[in-house]
Amino acid sequence: MPKVEIYTWRFCPFCIRAKQLLDRKGVTYTEYVIDGDEDARDAMVARGSDGKRSVPQIFIDGAHVGGCDDLYALERQGRLDPLLAVAS
């Protein structure tokens, strides 16, 4: 079963929007709230595939999905549900 992880800041509107999509789909995820924690942000960047320091950053089964726009793009393309099917 894939593990869904999301790195966020508490009041980030893009983080809230990404979590809303996952919540609507009934996905259980691990959230890492990294407000102001540069060590945690560096760890997030090291895991990612594109070096982005922005939040949110989303991982499904260890694979870097990207940010909020990337998550919604997968949804529009019909590619998100297959990724989440075994995670739900």
Residue ranges and their predicted role:
Residues 1-3, 85-88:
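Compositionally biased, disordered extreme N-termini, encompassing classical targeting presequences
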